[in-house]
Amino acid sequence: MREFTPTTLSEEERQELLGQLRRKEGRWLAWARACQTLLKNGLNPQTLFEATGFEPIQQNQITVAMQVYDSILRQDPPAHVRETYQEWGSDLLYELRELDQEQRSLCAQLALERKLDADQIREVAKATKDFCRLPKQPENFDRHPGDAVAHQCWRLAQERTDLTERSRLIARGLQFAQSAGARALIEALLLDLSGVPSRKPPMLPIYRLETEEDLPRLLPFAGTLPLSSSQIEAIAAVEAEGPFGLVSSPQGQQWLALPGWQAILTAEDPIACLEQIDRLPNAPEGPTEAVVLVVDRADRDWDADHFFLVEQAEGARIQWSPSAIAAPILGRLVLILRPKRVLDEAAIATPWQFEE
């Protein structure tokens, strides 16, 4: 079968390739190269199917298998491997598409040695892919597809309690094991005549903090307003230590834990206190309730865009002013936190009753 490089084809060359595919001249590699050439020259898969009888899924399979075959050639495989796959085996090579060149070559050889079909080589390829993804190569197992399957069987056999299933996995592992170390580990499983594997420890309950909000921030609690300036100033500044935000607590200090919201994280020296919401300037309409005020003592520069905790005659209060505040500023109001809304506590506490 005449081959064409994937450049711009003349109409005569195009018809010649279509005729060769329609008559299925040559072997699968020639078909794959013809399909690739025609597709790269603007023919769509459906039109190619109508002209040749090669379904789109078959076009894709043999084209991908051809690319796998070409990559295997770069690994200089034995002559019988090259020659065999020139004749047949596109379905086997297609299953190796997600492996690297080295593993493709080894799997292709293993498929011929073990006379594996497409379903079996798919399982081998998956085991090989999983094995190569392990952060550390398991001890006593080589980087070979056979040992990858053996490792999979060895691991699963230790988890099975059914003797029949365990025996099947051991037999399969011994069939594929390539290295002496892998074979020895699997043979050791045969010594356990009870068929009940020793119990392994459970998985560790490991979690990882993904965002700043996952890590709460502890704020020293000052009390309920109004407070004197001396009470505000007496609270020691808090500095969280380490990746988990450890806090050393002075004796007798009360604390309030809040989510790691950005407004709180950016505050340099925040403290928390309580106040009735109706006592705040520009308070929203509605029933009164106690709210948490977070105040940053490190920010004492007046700004008309913010509210401040200001020292007054009756004690510190939240204040806003369009012009500079003459009274001592004790800190900037960072946020106001309302309690969780409970719609009807009495209804929640009362069991529901239904009429028959």
Curated annotation (Swiss-Prot):
Keywords, sorted A to Z: Carbon dioxide fixation, Chaperone, Cytoplasm, Photosynthesis
Domain of life the protein comes from: Bacteria
Annotated region described as C-terminal beta-sheet, given as residue ranges: 216-342
Main localization of the protein described in the UniProt heading: cytoplasm
UniProt-reported outcome of changing residue 129 to A: Increases RbcL(8)-Raf1 complex formation, decreases RuBisCO holoenzyme formation
Keyword Magnesium: no
Pfam families, per the entry: Raf1_HTH (PF18579), Raf1_N (PF18578), RuBisCo_chap_C (PF18087)
Disulfide bridge positions per record: none
Phenotype reported upon loss of the gene: Decreased growth in ambient air, wild-type growth on 3% CO(2). In ambient air about 30% decreased levels of RuBisCO, decreased CO(2) fixation by whole cells. Carboxysome formation is impaired; many small, irregular electron-dense structures are present instead of the 3-4 large carboxysomes usually found in this strain, the ratio of CcmM58:CcmM35 (involved in condensing RuBisCO) rises over 3-fold. A double raf1-rbcX deletion partially recovers carboxysome formation.
Protein's name in the database: RuBisCO accumulation factor 1
Species of provenance: Synechococcus elongatus (strain ATCC 33912 / PCC 7942 / FACHB-805) (Anacystis nidulans R2)
Designated gene of the protein: raf1
